[in-house]
Amino acid sequence: MAHHKSALKRIKQNKKKYLRNKHIRSTLRTFIKRVREAVEAKNADQARQALLAAIPVIDKAASKGVIHASNASRNVSRLTKLVNTLG
């Protein structure tokens, strides 16, 4: 256990950030999963709607620093490509 006041504060801050990031990552995965499920079901309209809902969530996670900007860009690109296969 930490003895310094600053170390104790850091532990509290890290726990708070961990919980916040965990929630954002979980939400992010859910939105991505919805897009993939709609594509698997070959439901083009639902897939497009899910993609339009997922893109802001992915971008926001990147801007908050939860995921890297390149990771966000890659996710958006791959999901868009996947949805476009439905025509």
From Swiss-Prot:
A GO molecular-function annotation: small ribosomal subunit rRNA binding
- Please give the Gene3D superfamilies that the UniProt record associates with this protein: Ribosomal protein S20
UniProt keyword annotations, A-Z: Ribonucleoprotein, Ribosomal protein, RNA-binding, rRNA-binding
UniProt GO BP:
translation
Q: Does the keyword Transcription apply?
A: no
Report the InterPro entries cross-referenced here: Ribosomal_bS20, Ribosomal_bS20_sf
Domain of life the protein comes from: Bacteria
Family that this chain belongs to? Belongs to the bacterial ribosomal protein bS20 family.
Its job: Binds directly to 16S ribosomal RNA.
Its protein name is Small ribosomal subunit protein bS20
Upper taxonomic classification of the species? Bacteria, Pseudomonadati, Thermodesulfobacteriota, Desulfuromonadia, Geobacterales
Q: Which gene encodes it?
A: rpsT
